[in-house]
Amino acid sequence: NIDFANTSGAFVSGEADYTVEFEPAATLIEEQGAGYVVASVGKESGYVPYTAYSVKKSYLETHKELLEAFTRAIEKGQEYVNTHTPEQIAKVIAPQFKDTDRKTLEKIVERYAEQDSYKENTKFEKESFTLIQDILEEAGELEKRVDYET
């Protein structure tokens, strides 16, 4: 059992035979010649709603316009990544990845596009909702399923 922050280091040093990494760590391991990306957990598992935003009902009721604007901003970002090149996207996101060079960012963005990681909209599909509940249930983290229509 290795702390998540140390998984790539453990793999590169030979303490682990495999690792599951987020980007940019996965691509950096490849660039160091220390390993290869052989599969995408996301692609192999199906679309899992990995990132979600939630607020209390009281906040929703008092900040409806703000939350609608936030949702439009997310959709605008989705539209951007679906209509621009990896080079253009890498240029925009580069300030968020100060320790990662532009070519590496381009490679990561391209990999995500090839894996169909970028959604076209913010709709939380029933199939994905069921899949995340299956995963949580199998892990023993879900006491009771929630109806999609709720």
Predicted feature residues:
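Secondary-structure end/capping motifs
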Residues: E61-E143
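Residue-level signal for threonine
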Residues: K56, E125, T150
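Residue-level detector of short coil/turn "hinge" positions at structural boundaries
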Residues: Y36, E143-K144
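Pocket-lining segment of extracytoplasmic ligand-binding domains
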Residues: A5-F97
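Hinge/cleft segment of the Venus flytrap/periplasmic-binding protein
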Residues: K144-T150
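Short beta-strand-to-loop elements that line the ligand-binding cleft
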Residues: N1-D3
